[in-house]
């Protein structure tokens, strides 16, 4: 964008992906406004940086905008979108604005995949920040090391999380791509797993001749598309067949430690936060990026060792009375299995009490079979009503039905507490010393964990 007097309006500006782009544009000197259904700490932060924020969606909010940016959650009948189209104001998806930011930098690194995108993007951002690249970073989570979900750097690289949920990540033109995995997800947009794989193939095909795709060889759906890829590939995984591989995995004190091999030789060890095999994969992708950029392995190891984590990813919320509270964003069965496995590996002696909030009726319906068995690591499973995320209820899809199926598949202790507001107070009497409470989900389940921490401090 060649004029800095552009007025950029975001519909749904409080979203984790939208707010990061808005923050970068503010730092670049653009006029930014935005609306969201309700105020939040995120919208307050943007307001403090100079954005004009509207609570709720009204047609007048986009008046005077040069362009209107929408997230995939914004419907076409949103009054601001309708008004913008009537006024001939361009309406673009979030990914198109991210692509414009990427164009302003010399080299883009995009991280895509069904799971692990946020952590992997954050690790790569940390690596480049700690090794002198001073990258610009846009990520779908709040990263402790730079205190938010976006950072404007002076260097030539932009590191971004690429959202595949509506296919709009195809608007990006990165030089390096990471594909962490491909799983059945976002079936409100995709028809089936083959449709998802075809879209990822198109994404990889956007790499220029001098770029590369860094892909996880251990993921069966990623491996399935590799014969069709015509771009340069760098594979990573636990298999020794990968270009960059890990072995000798250990988990202790909340950290993952492993040995790295590349080009047939042992490079050394990496120790990174947090614990878990899935986090080893995330870190391996960052190692592969570092090696591709010719960063010495010792510097890669030092940089990744300094990584402090991402909020809502295996995040320690607090403890009291011998009870520990952890929060995690996992909401897909694959993510839930990985997170609970990692937690059990780290705290094998603790009773694991899981508070889960299902996210979206469509996801609960599409992945119903997978949800039946993904909680087996939990000693106690307590589930709230489904977080609708702007969806309408679907007949035959409910927490009660899901819990009955989970119980029928061997889960011993299950309980339904419909409302988040009463979850903490109803759970507290059943907790005992030595318990580990984990809040899981992509909605507002984190509030329950924070309330439990407060109650533990008051007793």
Swiss-Prot record:
Signal peptide: none
UniProt main location, coarse: cytoplasm
Record EC number: 6.3.2.8
Keyword Cell wall biogenesis/degradation: yes
The keyword Ligase appears for this protein: yes
PANTHER family: UDP-N-ACETYLMURAMATE--L-ALANINE LIGASE, UDP-N-ACETYLMURAMATE--L-ALANINE LIGASE-RELATED
Protein name per the record: UDP-N-acetylmuramate--L-alanine ligase
Protein's organism: Desulfotalea psychrophila (strain LSv54 / DSM 12343)
Gene name linked to the record: murC
């Amino acid at each position: 964008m060649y004029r800095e007097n552009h007025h950029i309006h975001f519909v749904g500006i409080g979203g984790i992906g939208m707010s990061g782009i808005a923050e970068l544009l503010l730092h670049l000197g653009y006029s930014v406004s935005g609306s969201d259904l309700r105020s939040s700490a995120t919208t307050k932060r943007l307001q403090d940086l100079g954005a004009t924020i509207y609570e709720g969606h009204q047609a007048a909010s986009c008046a005077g905008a040069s362009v209107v940016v929408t997230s995939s959650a914004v419907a076409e009948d949103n009054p601001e979108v309708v008004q913008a189209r009537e006024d001939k104001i361009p309406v673009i998806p979030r990914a198109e604005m991210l692509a414009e930011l990427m164009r302003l930098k010399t080299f883009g690194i995009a991280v895509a995949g069904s799971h692990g995108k946020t952590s992997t993007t954050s690790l790569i951002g940390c690596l480049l920040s700690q090794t002198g690249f001073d990258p610009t970073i846009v990520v779908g989570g709040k990263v402790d090391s730079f205190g938010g979900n976006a950072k404007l750097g002076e260097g030539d690289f932009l590191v971004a999380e690429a959202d595949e949920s509506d296919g709009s990540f195809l608007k990006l033109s990165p030089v390096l791509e990471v594909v962490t995995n491909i799983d059945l997800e976002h079936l409100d947009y995709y028809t089936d797993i083959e449709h998802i794989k075809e879209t990822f193939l198109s994404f990889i095909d956007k790499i220029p001749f001098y770029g590369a795709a860094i892909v996880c060889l251990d993921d069966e759906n990623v491996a399935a598309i590799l014969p069709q890829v015509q771009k340069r590939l760098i594979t990573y995984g636990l298999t020794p067949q990968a270009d960059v591989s890990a072995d000798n995995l250990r988990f202790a004190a909340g950290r993952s430690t492993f040995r790295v091999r590349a080009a047939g030789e042992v490079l050394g060890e990496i120790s990174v936060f947090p614990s878990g095999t899935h986090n080893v994969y995330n870190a391996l992708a960052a190692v592969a990026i570092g090696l591709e950029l010719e960063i010495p392995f010792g510097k890669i190891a030092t940089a990744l060792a300094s990584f402090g984590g991402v909020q809502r990813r295996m995040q320690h919320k607090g403890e009291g009375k011998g009870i520990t509270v952890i929060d995690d964003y996992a909401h897909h069965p694959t993510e839930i299995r990985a997170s609970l496995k990692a937690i059990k590996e780290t705290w094998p002696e603790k009773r694991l009490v899981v508070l889960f909030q299902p996210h979206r009726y469509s996801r609960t319906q599409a992945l119903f079979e997978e949800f039946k068995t993904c909680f087996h690591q939990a000693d106690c499973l307590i589930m709230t009503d489904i977080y609708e995320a702007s969806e309408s209820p679907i007949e035959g899809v409910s927490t009660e039905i899901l819990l009955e199926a989970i119980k029928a598949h061997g889960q011993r202790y299950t309980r339904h507490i419909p409302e988040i507001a009463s979850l903490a107070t109803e759970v507290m009497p059943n907790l005992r010393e030595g318990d580990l409470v984990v809040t899981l989900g992509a909605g507002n389940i984190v509030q329950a964990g924070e309330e439990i921490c407060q109650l533990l401090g008051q007793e």
